[in-house]
């Protein structure tokens, strides 16, 4: 190896000045082409990463979570319809039909956009079991119309079992499949982005190093202190290195903001929203099916604990007040606590605190419903449960949903902005990079041609 290097060094020293200048020119052109390839390849990789996270995977996950929401809310409205005499709760009937149409459309859209093998069977399960559930609910409605309470309860229990044990788990599985795929893709794309930036920097340094070496050679061998063309080529290479590095780093940062800051909050907020829908359904089931009232009450409390658990001696008001000041409350856990402990964007804290406060109002009304039911005031409990007027349960739940939606909208806007900015960061490189590389190559040629002409003359 040492002998080979020695021979190569000896061969180089035997080269004439024109040969060295031509060699430097060709090496500079080669390094320019390498920079062109590294930059375009890196830009395309960065753009693919942003598209995969922002346009492909994330919407699929949100769609799966919205399927969960619609299923849970549809069933809650079915229970609300059954709590009163036929025709007395048109709001519940309307909401049920809207959710039915929505969930059918979303499952159909998911079937048209299958990306992973696991999705195929999950979507088939959703399609088949949803049809069975809707048929069963229609049977329940028929029994309800005839005033057959036993038929209503027996068949509704079967429908509820389909929702709880098949449909909701299938929707959750669809969400999980897409979420894991997104996590894998994100990790892979981040690594690829780091490699791309590394190659761009290395190829840039190689090109800049060659240009500097040529100028030093001219200064030493030919007593030419300054070569304006080579200086311009070097300046362009340095500026382009700074510009491209900034663009790659900014695109990587915006991808991180979209995935880790905004989208993970969106996922948690939507998961919490889905749990809240299911808890709201348990509240109605508690009144609808007295035989299993304790079971439905415990299911409600379990879901509430997933959403929010307050430390001993604290209330929703005290925790909300502390959270509004940015204080972390020890012992405060659940999805709402996680959101309040992960505030990133302007207005997010205020919206999250409002969500917590509104949920506290809803829970207070739920306690009143159970107190009325346990006091034998079944009709009053139902009226409070299905009522949409201020001070009634459905009104309070709607207030909670609106506050939750505002928090979601803030994170969604941040996600969309980060994705849009990520695309802007790497926009136009397919045009600017060839222009820059061509300019460097041409300036190098123009800078060396007079020196080469001196020897050819």
Provide a role label for each language-model segment.
Residues 117-191, 333-401, 419:
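Polar/charged, Q/E/K-enriched amphipathic alpha-helical segments with strong coiled-coil propensity
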Residues 264-266, 270-271, 386-414:
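Extracellular/periplasmic juxtamembrane segments that couple receptor/chemosensory ectodomains to their
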Residues 1-23, 31-34, 38-64, 68-77, ...:
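N-terminal membrane-targeting/anchoring modules of bacterial envelope and secretion proteins
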Residues 36-71, 193-197, 237-276, 425-429:
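Amphipathic alpha-helical segments and their boundaries
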Residues 182-201, 415-432:
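Membrane-interface helix-start motif
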């Amino acid at each position: 190896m040492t002998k080979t290097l020695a021979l190569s060094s000896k061969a180089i020293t035997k080269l004439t000045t024109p040969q060295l200048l031509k060699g430097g020119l060709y090496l500079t052109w080669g390094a320019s082409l390498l920079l062109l390839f590294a930059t375009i390849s890196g830009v395309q990789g960065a753009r693919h990463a942003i598209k995969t996270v922002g346009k492909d995977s994330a919407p699929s996950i949100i769609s799966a979570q919205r399927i969960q929401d619609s299923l849970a809310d549809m069933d809650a409205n079915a229970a609300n319809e059954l709590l009163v005499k036929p025709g007395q709760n048109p709001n519940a009937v309307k909401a049920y039909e809207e959710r039915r149409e929505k969930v059918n459309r979303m499952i159909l859209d998911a079937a048209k956009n299958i990306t992973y093998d696991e999705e195929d069977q999950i979507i088939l399960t959703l399609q088949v079991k949803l049809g069975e559930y809707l048929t069963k609910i229609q049977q329940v409605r028929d029994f309800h119309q005839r005033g057959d309470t036993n038929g209503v309860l027996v068949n509704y229990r079967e429908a509820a079992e389909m929702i709880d044990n098949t449909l909701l788990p299938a929707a959750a599985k669809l969400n999980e499949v897409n979420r894991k795929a997104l996590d894998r893709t994100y990790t892979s794309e981040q690594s690829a982005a780091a490699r791309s930036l590394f190659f761009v920097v290395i190829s840039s340094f190689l090109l800049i190093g060659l240009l500097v070496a040529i100028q030093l050679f001219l200064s030493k061998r030919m007593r030419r202190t300054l070569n304006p063309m080579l200086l311009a080529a070097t300046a362009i290479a340095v500026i382009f290195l700074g510009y491209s590095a900034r663009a790659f780093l900014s695109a990587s940062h915006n991808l991180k903001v979209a995935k880790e800051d905004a989208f993970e909050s969106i996922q948690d907020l939507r998961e919490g929203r889905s749990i809240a829908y299911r808890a709201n359904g348990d509240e109605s089931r508690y009144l609808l099916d007295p035989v299993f009232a304790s079971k439905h009450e415990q299911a409600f409390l379990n879901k509430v604990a997933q959403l929010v658990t307050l430390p001993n001696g604290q209330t929703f008001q005290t925790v909300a007040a502390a959270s509004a000041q940015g204080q972390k409350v020890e012992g405060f856990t659940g999805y709402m606590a996680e959101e309040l402990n992960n505030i990133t964007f302007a207005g997010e804290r205020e919206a999250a605190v409002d969500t917590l406060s509104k949920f506290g109002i809803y829970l207070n009304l739920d306690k009143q419903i159970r107190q009325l039911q346990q006091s034998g005031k079944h009709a009053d409990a139902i009226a409070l449960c299905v009522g949409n007027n201020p001070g009634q349960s459905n009104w309070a739940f709607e207030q909670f949903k609106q506050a939750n939606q505002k928090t979601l909208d803030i994170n969604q806007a941040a996600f969309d902005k980060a994705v849009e900015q990520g695309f802007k960061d790497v926009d136009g490189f397919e045009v600017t990079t060839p222009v820059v590389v061509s300019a460097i190559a041409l300036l190098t040629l123009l800078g060396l041609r007079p020196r080469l002409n001196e020897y050819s003359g």
